[in-house]
């Protein structure tokens, strides 16, 4: 079996894939999510992983291939050691060199996050045409690939959860609130006002960036992924579809192309 890991700043998404004739099947058998905690040791992460496998009826001994897209460099060695110690295997890391042949138009490709690489590789694999991939995570990333499969670049904005947290941390009177769609834009309470600003202000940000990107290049498809994609989907009509496991799929595809 094949294990793909998307190590983000808030969560680590783990996808288990079956293999047949040395090829990874496209749909994950199971997906788990664990919190990203930089202080955890590889033994602690291994315990979590083994427990998830065990309780869902999977045999850890059947795992033989591992690939990681990480935007938390401090955890790379942790998972590399985990996989080496508990499974006796090497870890494949998605990066600008291990990118499955993705061509970068310009700029410093070394700075492009592994999750962003995985996202555009997966999107182009699905559509074979120009796309914007919007990943609603800790940060919200916009990544553009053209009809020739060349990665053009994109934009990065703070995610709504970060904005909500900072409003609470950097002020004395504003509470910490859940990011949710309010019933109307004019709030009556402080919480309602904050939720209006966070939700409608944020969806406005996304719509504006989509419009500006479309003014600069031809776009056929707009895809969303990430933890808050479902919350934003109804308000942003430009988004065509949500693909919740896009990053894991990209990790799988890159691994197959390189290995």
UniProtKB/Swiss-Prot annotation:
Signal peptide: none
UniProt KW keywords: ATP-binding, Coenzyme A biosynthesis, Cytoplasm, Kinase, Metal-binding, Nucleotide-binding, Potassium, Transferase
Gene3D superfamilies in the cross-refs: 3.30.420.40
Pfam family, any one: Pan_kinase
Reactions listed under catalytic activity: (R)-pantothenate + ATP = (R)-4'-phosphopantothenate + ADP + H(+)
InterPro entries: ATPase_NBD, Type_III_PanK
Active site: 115
GO terms of molecular function: ATP binding; metal ion binding; pantothenate kinase activity
Protein EC: 2.7.1.33
Subcellular locations according to the entry: Cytoplasm
Co-factor remark: A monovalent cation. Ammonium or potassium.
Pathway assigned to this chain's UniProt record: Cofactor biosynthesis; coenzyme A biosynthesis; CoA from (R)-pantothenate: step 1/5
Job description of the protein: Catalyzes the phosphorylation of pantothenate (Pan), the first step in CoA biosynthesis.
Subunit and interaction comment: Homodimer.
HAMAP family on file: Pantothen_kinase_3
Family (UniProt): Belongs to the type III pantothenate kinase family.
Name of this chain's protein: Type III pantothenate kinase
Annotated organism of origin: Endomicrobium trichonymphae
Taxonomic lineage from the root: Bacteria, Pseudomonadati, Elusimicrobiota, Endomicrobiia, Endomicrobiales
Gene name of the record: coaX
């Amino acid at each position: 079996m094949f294990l793909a890991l998307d190590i983000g700043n808030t969560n680590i998404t783990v996808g288990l894939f079956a293999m047949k004739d040395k090829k990874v099947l496209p749909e994950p058998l199971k997906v788990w999510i664990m919190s990203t905690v930089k202080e955890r040791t590889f033994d602690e992460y291994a315990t979590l992983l083994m427990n998830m496998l065990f309780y869902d009826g999977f045999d850890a001994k059947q795992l033989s291939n591992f690939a990681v897209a990480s935007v938390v460099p401090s955890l790379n060695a942790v998972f590399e050691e985990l996989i080496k110690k508990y499974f006796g295997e090497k870890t494949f890391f998605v990066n600008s060199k291990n990118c499955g042949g993705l061509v970068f138009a310009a700029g410093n490709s070394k700075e492009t996050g592994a999750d962003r690489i995985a996202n555009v590789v997966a999107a182009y694999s699905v559509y074979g045409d120009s796309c914007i991939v919007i990943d609603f995570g800790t940060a919200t990333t916009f990544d553009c690939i053209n009809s020739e499969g060349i990665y053009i670049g994109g934009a990065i904005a703070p995610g709504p959860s970060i904005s909500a947290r900072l409003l609470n941390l950097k002020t004395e009177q504003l509470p910490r609130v859940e990011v949710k769609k309010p019933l109307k834009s004019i709030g009556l309470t402080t919480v309602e006002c904050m939720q209006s600003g966070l939700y409608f202000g944020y969806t406005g940000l996304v719509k504006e960036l989509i419009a500006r990107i479309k003014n600069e290049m031809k776009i056929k498809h707009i895809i969303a992924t990430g933890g808050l994609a479902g919350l934003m989907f109804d308000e942003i009509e430009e988004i065509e579809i949500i693909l919740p496991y896009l990053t894991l799929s990209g990790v799988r595809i890159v691994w197959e192309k390189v290995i």
